[in-house]
Amino acid sequence: MSLSDLKPVIERAFENRDQINAQTKGEVRDAVNEALNALDSGKARVAEKFQGSWEVHQWLKMAVLLSFRLNDMSTIAGGPGENTNWWDKVPSKFEGWGEAEFRKAGFRAVPGAIVRRSAYIAPNVVLMPSFVNLGAHVDEGTMVDTWVTVGSCAQIGKNCHLSGGVGIGGVLEPLQANPVIIEDNCFIGARSEVVEGVIVGEGAVLSMGVFISASTKIIDRATGEVHIGKVPPYSVVVPGSLPGKANPDGSPAPSLYCCVIVKTVDAQTRAKTAINELLRD
């Protein structure tokens, strides 16, 4: 079936998801498997940019969710120790892969990198020991550094750097309407977290320890403009705080966390955050 043919089948199945289980056969199972294969190969993605705006294909997210009802628990090779397994419903992307498959895929996956089936990893990506969840899309030339987690259906652009310990939120639990999107050429500093469908605009730089959710205020220090849910392109963002209102007795109330845009990316910023082409040969 074509992608356009899969969509109505999956949408109908999702409406009747209480009737879907591991014994379900036929059209629904075939449609979900085809959708997951399309995500896994990069032929489809949960979100795409169209005429300057991001469009979310909710039916592909539905396919990911339905797969949990369709698939029973089973052993997955690669557990700790010799001849041991994991126990889950989602197989590894690398199940059955050998040298030929890795060479064709064109990315690096060092020991300790875990990718679940239906996540797409583009050529010239580097996966350090990290976790990429199902339905995610990691585009060309991106570095996924040590202990990074890329959540379900998250969209990571080209030539990004996700520094050590970064967390990119998923859509499955708690259930989110839209995935987190990191656009091309972004730098996400160590231990930062971006969740709840936030969009980080192209070329933006988040310093170490920046936490952004759908309700976090992102304040431009120069203009006072407040952004919520999206980091403007080419912004340099650091953690900050907003002063609390005074208590009834006049004492200061606790301040509230926010993010602060301190400047626009310049040559000095680019020099500090540039990707290393030597690591992608």
From Swiss-Prot:
One of its GO terms (biological process) is lysine biosynthetic process via diaminopimelate. GO terms for cellular component: cytoplasm. Substrate binds at residues 108, 145. Its main location: cytoplasm. It is found in: Cytoplasm. Disulfide bonds: none annotated. Pathway: Amino-acid biosynthesis; L-lysine biosynthesis via DAP pathway; LL-2,6-diaminopimelate from (S)-tetrahydrodipicolinate (succinylase route): step 1/3. Signal peptide: none annotated. GO terms for molecular function: 2,3,4,5-tetrahydropyridine-2,6-dicarboxylate N-succinyltransferase activity. CDD domains: LbH_THP_succinylT. Its EC number is 2.3.1.117. Keywords: Acyltransferase, Amino-acid biosynthesis, Cytoplasm, Diaminopimelate biosynthesis, Lysine biosynthesis, Repeat, Transferase. It catalyses: (S)-2,3,4,5-tetrahydrodipicolinate + succinyl-CoA + H2O = (S)-2-succinylamino-6-oxoheptanedioate + CoA. Belongs to the transferase hexapeptide repeat family. NCBIfam families: dapD, PRK11830.1. Homotrimer. HAMAP family: DapD. This is 2,3,4,5-tetrahydropyridine-2,6-dicarboxylate N-succinyltransferase. The gene is dapD.
